Amino acid sequence: MNHGSIHGPGYTGGDGIEAHTSLAGGKKLSDDFHIYAAEWEPDEVRFYLDNQLYATQSRASLKPAQKWAFDHPFFLILNVAVGGDWPGNPDDSTVFPQAMLVDYVRVYAHPGE
C-alpha cells in the first residue's frame, strides 16, 4: 500500500491529511520500481502513482484549526516506517532487514517561478 500524507500545523504525526492506493491485481509495490509524484500548487497537492492520480488534497479541505502547510517552508520525506503508532510495531512475521531503493528524485518548477 502506498501512502501520500501532508503534515503541518494542527495535523502532525497520526493526524496528517492522508490518501492511499494499491496496485491492481494484488501486486506488491516492492516487486518493481515505480514512479511516485506530487504536484504542488499554492492551494492543492495532487498525488500520483505510476502516472495515475490517486488523491488531491486542498487548502479548502482543512479543518478550522489546521493551517495550510505550504504557506511556510516545507520538505519532502521518503521513508520506510517501522514501529510506533503507525503502521504498528513489527511482529514475528516482519522480515528484516528492509530497504527502500530510490533510483532518482526530480524537482520541477513552472517556468518563471
What are these regions, as identified by a protein language model?
Residues 1-113:
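GH16 jelly-roll
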